[in-house]
Amino acid sequence: ICACLVGSEMCIRDRFISPHFPLYFHNFCSRLKNRGVNVLGIGDAQYSEISNETKESLSEYYRVNSLENYDEVYKAVAYYISKYGRIDFVESQNEYWLETDARIRSDFNICSGTKFEDLAVMKYKSKMKAVYESVGLNVARYCLIDNFENALNFIDAVGYPVVVKPDNGVGATSTYKLNNQAELEYFFATKDERIYIMEEYVNGHVETFDGITDSNKNVLIANSTIMLNSIMDNVNEHCDTAFCNRFVAGSDIEEIGTKVVKAFDTRSRFFHFEFFRLDSDKEGLGKKGDLVGLEVNMRAPGAYMPDMINFSYESDVYTIWADMVIYDKCFIELKQKYLVAYIGRRNDIGYMFDHDQLISQFGGNIMLDVDVPEVLSAAMGNHVYMVRTENQEHLDYLINEFLKRCDGSNWR
């Protein structure tokens, strides 16, 4: 992306990887363009296939045959540099392309974000743990499994169940809970060639600390979500998806999350940190209610969570992000006013209330109502409602009503 500020002597040259996907990512580009920035994108979709919103958010679009082919991406960046000058900012907001972003920064000496040689601690789950520990957080015991005997030795030490996932992976893809040796044997018989990390099972639920930082790692806006069920289970067991946020100011996760922000290279970016909140005492990890370090994601939270923040603050995180990129500050006075829940329903589950009934009964609370692209539906559900209210009791009621089964039973 090349970005030029209209009416200013300052010139920012900025490039956005895959601006067309996920669908709402055009908002990052549009806020820059609305501020007089010339926004240039690189993607592998045909120009005719990208949304009108994305087209209107870009000043120029360079199509490559595949974003997986770095030579093509390199040539695209070189083309933009030859036409517009030096690139100053590179972003995808997509975990899958973080390595591509970082490689471009290294190859073209772009200093506004993490370079490739410094990326490992943000991509490999095994390396993240040491950073969490450096700020005083406990982490689950783990080992990198390269053979069956190594896995058995680890399980002898921690017991079943265990969780396995790619050490360098995206989301909950290829993440499994193994309960016995038969499942372990099946995993080894069917797994791919990637390096997997095996962790002791933690009886807890995931909570996040998300936000935007300036170039000095100061948090400009923050949010925290509480996962009401496991994304791993959503994917593997085809469950509903539900999570909600909290009032973050003064919470323990704000205090700890801010320390984690300082420990990682979070300069000038969106961040999405994950923790376990222990649901029971766990020897070596902590007491019920304690936070345990899990993973970091150096991008905006997914699943329409940026919009959750918008609805909670009655603000616009895309504008805050764009102002951070251009001016390194936030100009908006922020106050979190509402609690918001994300509710993802499945097409093949029978619910008590159909869409029209939900709109009729709860329309005043519904802030977002959208179908989910098939490629994201395993984790997010097929159709999403985002609802908001002013107190936790009413929010819990809304979640339960939206997911209540046709026979009147609760969703969990």
Residue ranges and their predicted role:
Residues 1-12:
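Single conserved hydrophobic/aromatic residue that forms the stacking wall/gate
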Residues 13-21, 25:
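Nucleotide-activated donor-dependent transferases that construct or modify glycoconjugates
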Residues 42-60, 65-67, 125:
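Short, glycine/polar-rich helix-capping loops at beta-to-alpha or helix-loop-helix junctions
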Residues 80-87, 156-158, 192-193:
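Glycine-rich phosphate-binding loop signature in dinucleotide/nucleotide-binding domains
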Residues 82-123, 136-144:
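A short, GP-enriched loop/loop-strand-helix hinge that lies immediately N-terminal to
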Residues 138-140, 161-164, 173-208, 230-241, ...:
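Conserved ATP-binding module of the ATP-grasp superfamily
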Residues 200-266, 270, 277, 281, ...:
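ATP-dependent carboxylate/phosphate-activation module, predominantly the ATP-grasp catalytic core
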Residues 322-412:
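Peripheral (often C-terminal) accessory segments that flank ATP-dependent C-N-forming ligase machineries
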